[in-house]
Amino acid sequence: MADEQNLDAQAQDQAAEAGAGEELTTRVQVLEEQLAAAQDQSLRVAADLQNVRRRAEQDVEKAHKFALEKFAGDLLPIIDSLERGLDLSNPDDESIRPMREGIELTLKMFQDTLKRYQLEAIDPYGQPFSADQHQAMAMQESADVEPNTVLKVFQKGYQLNGRLLRPAMVVVSKAPSPATPSINEQA
Protein backbone atom coordinates (compact mmCIF):
# COMPACT_ATOMS: atom_id res chain seq x y z
CA MET A 1 0.00 0.00 0.00
CA ALA A 2 2.82 2.29 0.69
CA ASP A 3 4.07 1.47 -2.74
CA GLU A 4 0.73 2.41 -4.21
CA GLN A 5 0.75 5.72 -2.38
CA ASN A 6 4.27 6.43 -3.56
CA LEU A 7 3.26 5.62 -7.12
CA ASP A 8 0.20 7.86 -6.84
CA ALA A 9 2.33 10.67 -5.40
CA GLN A 10 4.90 10.23 -8.14
CA ALA A 11 2.18 10.29 -10.79
CA GLN A 12 0.72 13.44 -9.29
CA ASP A 13 4.17 15.02 -9.16
CA GLN A 14 4.81 14.09 -12.79
CA ALA A 15 1.41 15.45 -13.82
CA ALA A 16 2.11 18.68 -11.93
CA GLU A 17 5.56 18.93 -13.50
CA ALA A 18 4.09 18.29 -16.97
CA GLY A 19 1.45 21.00 -16.40
CA ALA A 20 4.13 23.37 -15.15
CA GLY A 21 6.33 22.48 -18.14
CA GLU A 22 3.50 23.23 -20.57
CA GLU A 23 2.81 26.48 -18.74
CA LEU A 24 6.49 27.44 -18.96
CA THR A 25 6.63 26.54 -22.65
CA THR A 26 3.55 28.68 -23.33
CA ARG A 27 5.04 31.52 -21.30
CA VAL A 28 8.35 31.28 -23.23
CA GLN A 29 6.48 31.37 -26.55
CA VAL A 30 4.51 34.46 -25.48
CA LEU A 31 7.69 36.20 -24.34
CA GLU A 32 9.49 35.31 -27.59
CA GLU A 33 6.58 36.76 -29.62
CA GLN A 34 6.65 39.93 -27.52
CA LEU A 35 10.42 40.20 -28.00
CA ALA A 36 10.11 39.77 -31.78
CA ALA A 37 7.38 42.46 -31.90
CA ALA A 38 9.51 44.83 -29.81
CA GLN A 39 12.55 44.24 -32.04
CA ASP A 40 10.43 44.84 -35.16
CA GLN A 41 9.04 48.06 -33.69
CA SER A 42 12.56 49.16 -32.74
CA LEU A 43 13.79 48.60 -36.31
CA ARG A 44 10.83 50.57 -37.71
CA VAL A 45 11.49 53.49 -35.36
CA ALA A 46 15.18 53.49 -36.30
CA ALA A 47 14.28 53.48 -40.03
CA ASP A 48 11.78 56.32 -39.52
CA LEU A 49 14.39 58.31 -37.63
CA GLN A 50 16.92 57.77 -40.41
CA ASN A 51 14.34 58.90 -43.03
CA VAL A 52 13.54 62.05 -41.04
CA ARG A 53 17.25 62.83 -40.69
CA ARG A 54 17.85 62.29 -44.43
CA ARG A 55 14.86 64.50 -45.36
CA ALA A 56 16.09 67.25 -43.04
CA GLU A 57 19.56 67.11 -44.61
CA GLN A 58 18.03 67.32 -48.10
CA ASP A 59 15.87 70.30 -47.06
CA VAL A 60 18.90 72.13 -45.67
CA GLU A 61 20.88 71.35 -48.84
CA LYS A 62 18.05 72.68 -51.03
CA ALA A 63 17.74 75.78 -48.87
CA HIS A 64 21.45 76.49 -49.30
CA LYS A 65 21.35 75.71 -53.01
CA PHE A 66 18.35 77.88 -53.85
CA ALA A 67 18.62 80.63 -51.22
CA LEU A 68 19.83 83.00 -53.94
CA GLU A 69 16.84 82.34 -56.20
CA LYS A 70 14.84 85.48 -55.36
CA PHE A 71 17.91 87.71 -55.21
CA ALA A 72 19.21 86.40 -58.54
CA GLY A 73 15.77 86.88 -60.08
CA ASP A 74 15.85 90.53 -59.01
CA LEU A 75 19.27 91.00 -60.69
CA LEU A 76 18.21 89.64 -64.09
CA PRO A 77 16.48 92.86 -65.29
CA ILE A 78 19.70 94.77 -64.55
CA ILE A 79 21.70 92.38 -66.71
CA ASP A 80 19.04 92.64 -69.43
CA SER A 81 19.31 96.45 -69.35
CA LEU A 82 23.10 96.39 -69.61
CA GLU A 83 22.94 93.99 -72.56
CA ARG A 84 20.23 96.07 -74.25
CA GLY A 85 22.31 99.22 -73.77
CA LEU A 86 25.28 97.57 -75.46
CA ASP A 87 23.11 96.29 -78.31
CA LEU A 88 21.63 99.74 -78.95
CA SER A 89 24.90 101.69 -78.77
CA ASN A 90 27.19 102.06 -81.76
CA PRO A 91 30.57 100.38 -81.09
CA ASP A 92 32.22 102.66 -83.66
CA ASP A 93 31.12 105.93 -81.99
CA GLU A 94 34.26 107.35 -80.35
CA SER A 95 32.28 109.73 -78.12
CA ILE A 96 30.66 106.86 -76.18
CA ARG A 97 33.51 104.36 -76.34
CA PRO A 98 34.63 104.89 -72.68
CA MET A 99 31.03 104.55 -71.45
CA ARG A 100 30.53 101.44 -73.59
CA GLU A 101 33.74 99.88 -72.22
CA GLY A 102 32.52 100.61 -68.68
CA ILE A 103 29.19 98.92 -69.40
CA GLU A 104 30.97 95.92 -70.94
CA LEU A 105 33.22 95.61 -67.89
CA THR A 106 30.28 95.92 -65.48
CA LEU A 107 28.31 93.32 -67.43
CA LYS A 108 31.28 90.92 -67.46
CA MET A 109 31.70 91.31 -63.69
CA PHE A 110 27.99 90.60 -63.20
CA GLN A 111 28.14 87.52 -65.42
CA ASP A 112 31.28 86.18 -63.71
CA THR A 113 29.68 86.63 -60.29
CA LEU A 114 26.48 84.89 -61.37
CA LYS A 115 28.45 82.01 -62.87
CA ARG A 116 30.34 81.59 -59.58
CA TYR A 117 26.97 80.96 -57.88
CA GLN A 118 25.81 78.49 -60.59
CA LEU A 119 23.43 80.95 -62.29
CA GLU A 120 23.73 80.16 -66.00
CA ALA A 121 22.28 81.97 -69.01
CA ILE A 122 20.13 80.12 -71.52
CA ASP A 123 20.77 81.53 -75.01
CA PRO A 124 19.07 79.05 -77.35
CA TYR A 125 19.64 80.77 -80.70
CA GLY A 126 19.69 78.14 -83.47
CA GLN A 127 18.74 75.30 -81.13
CA PRO A 128 15.54 73.24 -81.20
CA PHE A 129 12.68 74.76 -79.21
CA SER A 130 12.24 73.23 -75.74
CA ALA A 131 9.07 74.08 -73.82
CA ASP A 132 10.93 73.27 -70.59
CA GLN A 133 13.39 76.15 -71.03
CA HIS A 134 11.90 78.45 -73.66
CA GLN A 135 8.78 80.55 -73.96
CA ALA A 136 7.62 81.02 -77.56
CA MET A 137 6.62 84.64 -78.12
CA ALA A 138 5.94 84.24 -81.85
CA MET A 139 6.13 81.79 -84.74
CA GLN A 140 7.79 82.76 -88.01
CA GLU A 141 7.91 80.92 -91.32
CA SER A 142 11.40 79.98 -92.42
CA ALA A 143 12.69 77.73 -95.17
CA ASP A 144 16.30 78.18 -93.98
CA VAL A 145 16.01 76.11 -90.77
CA GLU A 146 14.08 73.11 -89.50
CA PRO A 147 10.64 73.78 -88.01
CA ASN A 148 10.66 74.40 -84.23
CA THR A 149 14.12 75.98 -84.28
CA VAL A 150 14.79 79.16 -82.30
CA LEU A 151 15.20 82.01 -84.81
CA LYS A 152 15.53 84.92 -82.42
CA VAL A 153 16.01 85.43 -78.69
CA PHE A 154 14.08 88.38 -77.23
CA GLN A 155 15.34 87.74 -73.72
CA LYS A 156 17.82 85.19 -72.37
CA GLY A 157 16.62 82.65 -69.88
CA TYR A 158 18.46 81.66 -66.71
CA GLN A 159 18.75 78.61 -64.52
CA LEU A 160 20.08 78.34 -60.98
CA ASN A 161 21.75 75.04 -60.08
CA GLY A 162 19.92 73.37 -62.95
CA ARG A 163 16.50 74.71 -61.93
CA LEU A 164 14.80 77.09 -64.36
CA LEU A 165 14.69 80.61 -62.95
CA ARG A 166 13.35 82.35 -66.06
CA PRO A 167 12.57 80.87 -69.49
CA ALA A 168 14.17 82.35 -72.60
CA MET A 169 11.66 84.35 -74.65
CA VAL A 170 12.08 83.31 -78.27
CA VAL A 171 10.74 83.36 -81.82
CA VAL A 172 10.32 79.84 -83.20
CA SER A 173 10.45 78.77 -86.84
CA LYS A 174 7.64 76.99 -88.60
CA ALA A 175 7.46 75.39 -92.02
CA PRO A 176 6.51 77.76 -94.82
CA SER A 177 2.89 77.48 -95.87
CA PRO A 178 2.31 76.24 -99.39
CA ALA A 179 1.97 79.07 -101.89
CA THR A 180 -1.61 79.78 -102.86
CA PRO A 181 -2.12 80.07 -106.59
CA SER A 182 -2.68 83.60 -107.86
CA ILE A 183 -5.63 84.63 -110.00
CA ASN A 184 -3.50 84.46 -113.17
CA GLU A 185 -2.41 80.88 -112.38
CA GLN A 186 -5.99 79.76 -111.85
CA ALA A 187 -7.16 81.04 -115.26
UniProtKB/Swiss-Prot annotation:
What are the BP-aspect GO terms?
A: protein folding
Q: Which PROSITE patterns match?
A: GRPE (PS01071)
Q: Give the start-end ranges of region Disordered.
A: 1-23
List GO terms (cellular component aspect).
Answer: cytosol
| Molecular function in Gene Ontology | adenyl-nucleotide exchange factor activity; protein homodimerization activity; protein-folding chaperone binding; unfolded protein binding
Keyword check for Transport? no
Instruction: Name the keywords, alphabetized.
Output: Chaperone, Cytoplasm, Stress response
Please state where this protein is localized.
Cytoplasm
Q: What is its main location?
A: cytoplasm
Keyword Cytoplasm: yes or no? Answer: yes
Q: Which regions are flagged for Low complexity bias?
A: 7-23
Family per record: Belongs to the GrpE family.
Q: What does this protein do?
A: Participates actively in the response to hyperosmotic and heat shock by preventing the aggregation of stress-denatured proteins, in association with DnaK and GrpE. It is the nucleotide exchange factor for DnaK and may function as a thermosensor. Unfolded proteins bind initially to DnaJ; upon interaction with the DnaJ-bound protein, DnaK hydrolyzes its bound ATP, resulting in the formation of a stable complex. GrpE releases ADP from DnaK; ATP binding to DnaK triggers the release of the substrate protein, thus completing the reaction cycle.
Query: How does this chain assemble?
Result: Homodimer.
Q: What is this protein called?
A: Protein GrpE
Native species of this protein? Pseudomonas savastanoi pv. phaseolicola (strain 1448A / Race 6)
